[in-house]
Structure formats: C-alpha cells, structure tokens
Amino acid sequence: LHTPELEIYNERREVQLLHYYEPERGLFIAESPNVILRALAAGYEPLSLLMEQREADSEKGREILGRIAEVSGEIPVDVASNEVLSEISGFKLARGMLCAMRRRALPKMEDLCGNARRIAVLENVVNPTNVGAIFRSAAALGIDAVLLTGGCSDPLYRRAARVSMGTVFQVPWTILETKDWPEHTMEQLRKMGYHTVAMALKEDSLRPDDEKLHNVEKLAIILGTEGEGLAADTIADCDDTVCIPMAHGVD
C-alpha cells in the first residue's frame, strides 16, 4: 500500500499536493466517475488512476479508461477492493475511483471576466463543501465565472469537486491576490463595467428581483464567509446590497 505510485493518494495531504510535486501548478485528486469525466472533458491531464474492480468493469469505467488512452496514452492504473482503496485514501469511498491529475495555471481576472456578464465573487468561504455547492449553483444559474479570495477553500479539493458534481471544471474560476482584495479588485471590476452587489443583511438591501437590477448589463455578486458574512469594508465598496427574503427569521 505504500509504493511510490500510490504515495500521492495516501501520504500527502491535499494542501501538500498543491505545492509539493510542482510548485507552480501542483496536483489534485479527482474522486468519482462523474467528476473524473468532467475533469477530462475540461482538458485536465491525468497522471494515475486508482479504482475498484467493479468500476473498471462498468460502462463509465471503460469510458474513462478510453478517454485517458486517447489523451495521455499509458498511465499507471491500479485496481483494488473498496477496503484497500479506503485504507489508502484514509476514508470510506462510496464511488470507488480516484484519479491524480495535474493542475493548470490559473487565468488572470481580466481575461476571465472581460467578456462575462454575470460573475460571483467568494470572500473567505472556507468549507470545501460550501465552495462545491456554490459552484454547482453557479453552473445551474448561468454564472459565467467565479473569483475566489485567497482565504477560500480550493475548488479542486476532493470534497469541493465532488459536491460540485464536477462543475468546478465547467465554470471558469481563478484565485485573487490577497493584496488586491477588496479595493483593487473592486476598482478593476468597475473599469470592466461591472455593477457590484454584496449579499448582506441590511435594512436597505434590495431584493433580487428589484427593478434597479433588471437592466444591469454586467453584474458581480459578492458572497461572504460562513457565519460572519462579508467584511464591512467589502460591503462598503459595493454599489448595492442584496438580500434574499426568508421566512421564520432564517438568514
């Protein structure tokens, strides 16, 4: 279980994978057939594959092996029982397949947002499950791009990608420089024509269906961290605040 080929699966934490193997790009682990398929479709390079026998024999398993053969030729493929895979990964696997993949250089914010119309900006969303859920919602609602501050969980963390159902490979995103947030980033967004709205609980917050927002050509929706929400300085830098009405005091 501790061969060099399996080291990336059982001896490195995800934050180490980001820097240890290739400081400029690093690696990540994609989990589950659907997530792996979407990562391959997005052009991410597979480096090795670890899977249960039942997954290797499944239709999606054969599809994944076929796609990998097309784009990368031969890579290490290890087949084992669910118990062995769970021991290697350190937790119970429900979907029986892990793929080590190479990260790509992140795009610049200007390139990502130049032609977009609707973007989401995440400020210090630290839980990978929440990041994944936001990406899934962003994909469903037609958000063109997502910007994340440096304090956010990595969208390519295993849990984030799994919860997103692989949409982290479909919705373009990048991580902002800490020194640029929020003042410089807000200034850049305005220069690109964005109307910025903070999702915040304030008495003067607009409803999402407010007429003021109907004809906004380019909209940047700013969402804050779990619990505390957006920082006061961030809210002050936005053009408007928006609040989704909820019953029973739920916020």
Task: Outline where the language-model segments fall.
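Anion (oxyanion) recognition and catalysis
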Residues: 40, 69, 190-191
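Glycine/small-residue-rich loop that forms an oxyanion/phosphate-binding "nest" at active or ligand-binding sites
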Residues: 65-94
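RNA substrate-binding interface of SAM-dependent RNA methyltransferases
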Residues: 74, 78-79, 83, 105-204, ...
